[in-house]
């Protein structure tokens, strides 16, 4: 599947199929330095994903389990050892698009939109404000 990489100020778009592995790395320092939900808080059940600690996200269809919560702008992951056996849920703390030129806090509507896109095998949109880098996509 093709991966389209845009400049950092733009979005990264990837067309993913259910069952594909998405390998990403995130520089958490962006969220730590620029604020955002969870930034600076103590999260004993989370791990920090950095360039030296990449993780693969398995795209699956079905109901999203809120136990596993992936934040694109920080990539917090509950129970990372079980990530391959769960459904990834994406949360955007701030997004920009043609309808919302200024970054806005994520609403349930955006979560629903992202979930529907993954379920329907449509385009998955990642906001690279936290310096998200798509490394590989494989089936």
Where are these regions (language model features)?
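Surface-exposed, low-hydrophobicity beta-strand/loop segments enriched in small/polar/acidic residues
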Residues: 1-139
